Amino acid sequence: MEKLNKESESDPKNNGPFTQVYQKGWERIRELSKDKQGVVAIPLYSFLAEHIDPSCGAVVADQQFLADKLGVSRSTIKRWLNYLESKNALVRIPVAGKVCAYALDPHEVWKGYNTSKNYAAFVTKTLVNKDGDIQRRIMAMFSN
């Protein structure tokens, strides 16, 4: 992960080490802040926003990895994911076994080029690029 962040910082085309948050993204944060379930799910939403892959707007990880990173149980992550999915804040795309891609709305948060938003995993519900090829370069996060 550190290597990925250093590569992003050194290549100005990758928008550096920041995530763009749009008006709709700030509205999402305010919406999540309105109820108890939303408030506790904000750390997961912000972690995903911070680590989305610029090419597809998703994080590929297993739930245990997310739990370890956020210092909570896997069942808490599962509860937060279900809540965020029910609020249309993220799309869950099964990858293999317990590993999923978690995609955020590119009109809320984004790291890549503006022209690639139409091919974001949140929009297409799959990991593809603008040529229709399955995205194989995506950074995967695992607990092992």
Language-model-detected regions and their locations in the chain:
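Winged-helix/helix-turn-helix nucleic-acid-interaction surface
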Residues: 2-5, 79-144
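Alpha-helical structural elements
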Residues: 13, 17, 21, 40-42, ...
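Alpha-helical interaction segments
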Residues: 7-16, 35, 70, 92, ...
